[in-house]
Amino acid sequence: TMVPKGSIVLDNHNGTAPGLIMEKKGKIAILLPGPPNEMVPMFEESVYPYLRKKQPEIIYSRMVKICGIGESQVAEEIQDLIEKQTNPTIAPYAKTGEVHLRITAKAENEKKCKEMIKPIVHELKKRFGKDVFATKEEKTLEEAVVDLLKEKNMTLSLAESCTGGAVAARIVNVPGVSEALMCGFVTYTNRAKRKCLGVKKSTLKNEGAVSAKCAKEMAKGGAKAAETDVCLSVTGLAGPGGGTEETPVGTVFMGCCCKGKTVTREYHFTGNRSRIRGQAVAQALTFIRDCLLECR
């Protein structure tokens, strides 16, 4: 077998191609077979132990997820922490409608890393309060919403227009959501808004389908029709056409009816049709969560 001089041969217990580790002038090159069923076991059995000997410290991370406020505001709030950070470190990541903060520590073991990270997580929760929806990397915003619904023993329905059922699609990603989500209405036309949700003809004529009043009536009508504790409505202009000076493309109104009380919000999103709809879905989840936190 042709093996570079001084290299370490890694046995392949799941195939024929061996792996190699080569060291030269402080640099390390690691060659592994391509198929995942060969590469992953080889990494775990041979490469990981080799690297641990080279670097006795481990790196451990934890995520703090925030919704309802933008990346620039989050960055401003934690500027002092970032400026004086050494170990642990905080790294912000922007996602549509969310900001994720990854806190990373380096220490001799996982327990020590967790001890170092804990006060940082505590400080972030203190600064951002209810806007923190998760401190685990795997937890999603829709899971946070469903958890709140179950915790409060409340049911949810959705009345969507411009998002076309995309809010419902996000929520049904969560296993066991049938305990909380009753149904969703996709009322894209004015006729459907009247027939399914009881939106008044006068509202559609005088205020228009893209209005706070329409969003309010959609939410109230959806809650009544579905007999749910909560109903979230979305109506807006995703474009590319249909916008006016008074109601430009990207204008979205949402209503949330929680136990008979309905509040509305107005948003102005930018981007193409897909991006506007994506932002609307993310803000809809945040809106539901906010209403649930305030609903008694």
Each language-model region and where it sits:
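Proline/glycine-rich low-complexity loops and linkers
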Residues: 1-54
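Short beta-strand
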Residues: 10-11, 90-95
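Short beta-strand elements
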Residues: 21-22, 92-94, 105, 253-258
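Short glycine-/aliphatic-rich beta-strand segments at the starts of folded cytosolic domains
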Residues: 54-70
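Short amphipathic alpha-helix segments
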Residues: 69-87
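A short linear hydrophobic-aromatic micro-motif
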Residues: 86-92, 229-233
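Terminal amphipathic helices with adjacent charged low-complexity linkers/tails
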Residues: 95-119
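Short alpha-helical segments enriched in small residues
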Residues: 112-296
